[in-house]
Amino acid sequence: MGTRVAVAGASGYAGGELLRLLAGHPDLELAAVTGGTSAGKLVTEVHPNLTGHPALLGQAFGTTDAATLGDAELIFMALPHGESAALAAQLPGARIIDLSADFRLGDEAAWEKFYGVPHAGQWTYGLPELPGAREKIAVARTVAAPGCYATTSILALAPLLAAGLAAPDDIVIVAASGTSGAGRSPRPDLLASEVMGSMSAYKVGGTHRHTPEIEQALTEVIRGSSPLTGTAAVVRGVSGGSPPLTGTAAVDTSVTISFTPTLAPMPRGILATCTARLAPGVADGPDPDATLRAAFADAYGSSPFVHLLPTGQWPVSGAVAGSNGAHVQAAADIHAGRAVVVATTDNLGKGAAGQAVQIANIMLGLPETAGLTTLGVEP
């Protein structure tokens, strides 16, 4: 018998992906599955891709309430923003992983500016690849899973900022997302005739809700950074760059980003192109590309899910589809004096359900890779 887990809000895309991963997990046992307006329907009626798995045979969605979920040892919440906070308040003492934004931000003013509802508080931030994050997740009772754009962008930029290779106040992110990132509710702008063969920008001008989340996480990376060790330190010793900020400079430094999301004609995936002004001295080194890549090799060399691609190979969103993997690549644009980093994830995988399972594995002391894969689906 494995750990009994429940999924609240399993009728959406992220919730359905959670069910797919949990059904095949060697150490987790599905208990309650709830689905809001889908309550009473068979899981396989809403998610026909799950047909035939014994763990879901005859399983119907229950109502999303504390009584239905309370017997689980761990609860995944894949609910709309606002609903998670309300439900969590009814489950004191429960171990919860929340896939919504309700508990990601610590700044009350930023939360209310971007979400327009009262701040519910902040939980442990669940991006395991951040410095010290695994240790915090392992002892946490409640964890806020990061957003999809945030996950991809933070993975792309954190190594540069931690190593002092880029300016924290001159960062531009343009990221494309598949349509599943907008959820399952029908909308005219998500109709096939509107999306196929076309791309569009939205939430332009710094208004996307993942903006403060990205800034918060990257600011904490800078304020908690320490001098590099290993390969990156050796390369930087030759190539130059600014030392990681320490003392008052680190405490007073905040990250500012310009973030523009775009909608791409694909069902799933995130491709983030991130640029940042190079720190003084980096462009003058003998091999600026190697300097940047060394920071990523140092940060993710032991990561089971984040992979620095070989020199000259750039991330392709389809390569991580259906997986919990993330691919990154970095190069120096000497002409513009900027670092260029491209990263890709599956917005339903590492950007949502896969990452939630990764968090659960860490919380429960299981192998971090249990029930997960880095192998994408091709084509």
What are these regions (language model features)?
Residues 1-204, 223-224, 230, 247, ...:
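N-terminal Rossmann-like NAD(P) cofactor-binding subdomain of oxidoreductases
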Residues 12, 81, 117, 121, ...:
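Electropositive phosphate-/nucleotide-binding environments in soluble metabolic enzymes
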Residues 17, 21, 155-159, 213-217, ...:
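Alpha-helical scaffold segments in soluble metabolic enzymes
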Residues 27-67, 174-175, 179-233, 237, ...:
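C-terminal substrate-binding/catalytic lobe of Rossmann-fold NAD(P)-dependent oxidoreductases
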Residues 263-265, 345-351:
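Glycine-rich phosphate/pyrophosphate-binding beta-alpha loops
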Residues 344-347, 357-379:
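C-terminal lid/capping helical subdomain adjacent to the catalytic/cofactor pocket in oxidative enzymes
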